[in-house]
């Protein structure tokens, strides 16, 4: 038996020579574990009697989620693939879970050089697992929210010639202006800036975790319908993420707490930049809900919905 190249089938193209997205934890946004067992007559059967059969050289594609990543922001969907680049067919089940919810559970027979590819269209934490009666073991791969960037990213769980499994993450490496992923330690504050200094404005959106638990959040800033900033923050207790705006114009900030799906939106106008120390403060409470308030030190008003 021999292995055939598969990564080109993922359509990721050549790796760009530019720097990657601004991220302080890229290496931790993907991980993989494996466990090997011998095959035999006592192998567990697939959980479903409907088995997808993918012909040699073909790819079966699935879409998982509501498509929210295509609706706005600077991040794009990521893919998880179960691939068989060997010359022999293999049976396996690809299971993908979003937090505690199973979102895909598909038994499949992959002929030689065949694959099953799932596109994840909602930003969240995912775990993928492959196992099967013709495979020597199982493989698990995880994708954290920060693994969704402006790049084309794919995690492939691949059958080897000896029927074991391996996991590889492949991504283009284009620069991603405005895309930030950060873990903020307890009591700390991290600050990012949108626009150039001296551009005539200074306004801040402040997102604070006022609880004793850690929360993962997404903070987007748009001008009109154009995305300008897309941050994913894991906020430890009593930590804050700040986005400072330097361009004097209208902005909309959209915030979401992953896990509770709580959302909030705040808007500012060019006139709001006249306020001294102008800021909109957003707080996460113990239930994972969001509250929006104008900085009490400023006299202007900010609309929120």
Which role fits each region the language model picked out?
Residues 1-305:
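Terminal disorder- and signal-encoded targeting elements
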